[in-house]
Design a protein with these regions (language model features):
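Short, acidic, metal-binding catalytic loop of nucleotide-sugar glycosyltransferases
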Residues: 21-30
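Short beta-strand/loop segment that forms part of the nucleotide-sugar
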Residues: 30-40, 62-63, 92
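A conserved acidic beta->alpha catalytic loop
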Residues: 37-46, 96
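Acceptor/aglycone-binding surface of glycosyltransferases and processive sugar-polymer synthases
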Residues: 64-83, 100-183, 210-224, 243
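Catalytic donor-sugar/metal-binding loop of nucleotide-sugar-dependent glycosyltransferases
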Residues: 153-154, 177-181, 190-207
């Protein structure tokens, strides 16, 4: 079963090769990586091109013209992975906050459900101990209280960016109805999947702070994403399983 790991990048020159190597070291059959790069000025794309020459059929690069947002990057990556014939698509960050070691667990659980979420907020899940208490509290409140209450979601880690999707699930969601472009993209994808009746399971992960580079998730971005939850509710509150797109 062809599995493609979609990783969006912007200025991840120090991380992109190590994350690729870590994924390949898993030794999983029929697994490849698709990097979606937003024209990084630090040479991330050039590093991927070099890796492509040395590892044909194991890594691909989707160049985008500029930094247009996380949502658009993922939608472009998902569409390309589907075109490439992926039966399973894993999404994750490039900075090792999502450890590749969890990929086999995601894939194993996906045999029984439609979406698997690498979750910080189920039993056994954990956040990096280096997080300040205020940062932890904000993240917990946004996921466990604010977003779940507004959207009446069952998924505990609604902003999780580490997921495994079945091909049929992504096709049934219809990516064209997903409009969020920032970090609220993760919330909208999870909410629509729930409303359409897809089976979602969360597995615990340890979320490590990025090893190298600066986080792109600022306080203003978090506040904006929280406010956009109301837009997600307005757009999709009436969805039912009958609204699944025909694959």
């Amino acid at each position: 079963m062809r599995t493609i790991v979609v990783i969006p990048t912007y200025n991840e020159a120090d991380n992109v090769e190590p994350i690729f190597q870590a994924i390949m070291a898993l030794g999983l059959p029929d697994l490849s990586v698709l990097i979606v790069d937003d024209h990084s000025p630090d040479g991330t794309g050039e590093i991927v091109e070099r890796l492509m020459r040395g590892h044909p059929n194991q890594i691909e690069l989707l160049h985008r013209s500029g930094k247009e947002g996380l949502g658009k990057a993922y939608k472009a990556g998902f569409a390309r992975a589907l075109e490439m014939g992926a039966e399973v698509i894993v999404q994750m960050d490039a900075d090792f906050s999502h450890s590749p070691k969890y990929i086999p667990q995601l894939l194993e659980r996906l045999k029984e459900v439609d979406v698997v979420v690498g979750s910080r907020y189920v039993m056994g899940g954990k956040l990096d101990e280096r997080w300040e208490f205020g940062r932890y509290l904000l993240s917990w409140w946004a996921n466990a209280i604010y977003t779940r209450l507004i959207l009446n979601m069952q998924t505990k880690d609604s902003t999780a960016g580490f997921k495994a999707w079945r091909r049929a699930t992504l096709l049934g969601l219809d990516l064209e109805r997903i409009h969020s472009n920032g970090y609220d993209f993760q919330v909208e994808m999870a909410y629509v999947a729930e409303k359409l009746g897809y089976r979602i399971q969360e597995i615990p992960i340890y979320f490590e702070d990025r090893r190298i580079g600066k986080s792109k998730m600022s306080i203003p971005i978090k506040i904006e994403s929280a406010l956009r939850v109301w837009d997600v509710l307005a757009r999709h509150r009436g969805l039912t399983p009958k609204d699944r797109a025909q694959a």
